[in-house]
């Protein structure tokens, strides 16, 4: 019951605290193309995460599950939306269902709604090989997300305090998993050093989960008697984290998430090097406040606007969008220079 109550608290406080929008994309400007030589009607948006082919560079990221009927209904609606637009979708952490079988229905519902969809299972980094296998089987997942949430756990009144052995557990899961493993942050971003460590143990896909979206430190602080306010602005902004990711020069696939709300955010994230983008809090807010059909319509508009932007840039495919020229400026530029990451190549390609 404690875990289920926490799941419901997370939804309530995530909606009430909102998204910070400090993702850093305001520091990214496209170089205008007066002769784009493009046609809106021939723009395609297919992409890949590792070996997984996706029809869209937008997917529904991990949000909830394990909180009884309310979270079952949310996942049911999100699965319907995913089916309408042929989007991939991740569920929230399934540890609740591994601890309490009665909560499994709140996750399994997605396969009932969308039998042929692409779904990602989800567990924390404390998971064992056996738990990872059970989570994948529970929803017949196409991939497994392992989330890293140190700051959330430290801020959570009942959270973990021991983070030793995490990389070793991830390596074991990667070696034994029958589906691709995606390691994700939850709103605090990832450094290039962290991503290189993950690549070294066989991880092939990372969701950078940057600062700028739902702030789980703020969410957990709402549940505390004594706030740890110093964690409320902790993390690496989304745009910065994407560039840190691409600077590692390995074969990782990257998912950009963290405050992404518009087609321009999507386009900038992909142009910086992401393979796809993920929406969570923004979609949840629309669903809860405006209803399921409004969310279906919003995603349609996102795709339309993304194709407009790609047309303006002369990018006929997602792969071409990844190589359009842009300029990195402001706080993002200064952070990256201090980190020894040169951004000039973005403006000269």
From Swiss-Prot:
A Pfam family assignment = FMN_dh
Tell me the keywords, alphabetical order. Answer: Cytoplasm, Flavoprotein, FMN, Isomerase, Isoprene biosynthesis, Magnesium, Metal-binding, NADP
What is one term from the GO cellular component aspect held by the record? cytoplasm
**InterPro entries tied to this protein:** Aldolase_TIM (IPR013785), FMN-dep_DH (IPR000262), IPdP_isomerase (IPR011179)
Reply yes or no: does the keyword Flavoprotein apply. yes
* Coarse class of the protein's main subcellular location: cytoplasm
Which EC number applies? 5.3.3.2
- Give an example GO molecular function: isopentenyl-diphosphate delta-isomerase activity
Which positions in this protein are listed as binding Mg(2+)? 153
Answer yes or no on keyword Cytoplasm: yes
| Protein location | Cytoplasm
Which cofactor does this sequence's record say it needs?
A: FMN; NADPH; Mg(2+)
PANTHER family documented for this protein: ISOPENTENYL-DIPHOSPHATE DELTA-ISOMERASE
Q: Which family, according to the similarity comment?
A: Belongs to the IPP isomerase type 2 family.
Quaternary state and partners of this protein?
A: Homooctamer. Dimer of tetramers.
The protein's job, in short, is: Involved in the biosynthesis of isoprenoids. Catalyzes the 1,3-allylic rearrangement of the homoallylic substrate isopentenyl (IPP) to its allylic isomer, dimethylallyl diphosphate (DMAPP).
Name used for this protein in its record:
Isopentenyl-diphosphate delta-isomerase
Q: Which organism is it from?
A: Bacillus cereus (strain G9842)
């Amino acid at each position: 019951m404690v875990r289920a109550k926490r799941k419901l608290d997370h939804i309530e406080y995530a909606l009430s605290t909102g998204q910070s929008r400090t993702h850093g994309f305001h520091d990214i400007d496209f170089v205008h193309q007066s002769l784009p030589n493009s046609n809106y009607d021939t723009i395609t948006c297919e992409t890949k995460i590792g070996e997984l082919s996706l029809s869209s560079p937008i997917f529904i990221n991990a949000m909830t599950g394990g909180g009884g009927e309310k979270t079952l209904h949310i996942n049911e609606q999100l699965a319907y939306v995913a089916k309408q637009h042929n989007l991939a979708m991740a569920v929230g952490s399934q540890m609740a269902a591994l601890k309490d079988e009665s909560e499994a229905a709140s996750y399994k519902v997605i396969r009932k709604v969308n039998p042929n969809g692409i779904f990602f299972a989800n567990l924390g980094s404390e998971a064992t090989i056996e738990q990872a296998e059970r989570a994948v089987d529970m929803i017949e997942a196409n991939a497994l997300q392992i989330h890293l949430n140190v700051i959330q756990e430290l801020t959570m009144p009942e959270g973990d305090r021991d983070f030793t052995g995490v990389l070793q557990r991830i390596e074991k899961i990667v070696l034994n998993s029958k589906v691709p493993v995606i390691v994700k942050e939850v709103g605090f971003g990832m450094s290039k050093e962290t991503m290189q460590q993950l690549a070294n143990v066989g991880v092939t896909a990372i969701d950078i989960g940057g600062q700028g979206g739902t702030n789980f430190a703020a969410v957990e602080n709402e549940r505390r008697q004594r706030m740890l306010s110093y964690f409320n602005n902790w993390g690496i902004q989304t745009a910065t984290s994407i560039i840190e990711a691409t600077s590692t020069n390995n074969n990782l696939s990257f998912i950009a998430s963290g405050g992404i709300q518009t087609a321009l955010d999507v386009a900038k994230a992909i142009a910086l090097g992401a393979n796809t983008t993920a929406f969570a809090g923004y979609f949840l807010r629309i669903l809860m406040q405006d209803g399921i059909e409004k969310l279906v319509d919003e995603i349609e508009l996102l795709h339309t606007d993304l194709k407009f932007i790609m047309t303006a840039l002369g990018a006929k495919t997602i792969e071409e969008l990844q190589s359009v020229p842009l300029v990195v400026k402001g706080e993002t530029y200064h952070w990256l220079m201090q980190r020894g990451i040169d951004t000039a190549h973005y403006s000269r390609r």
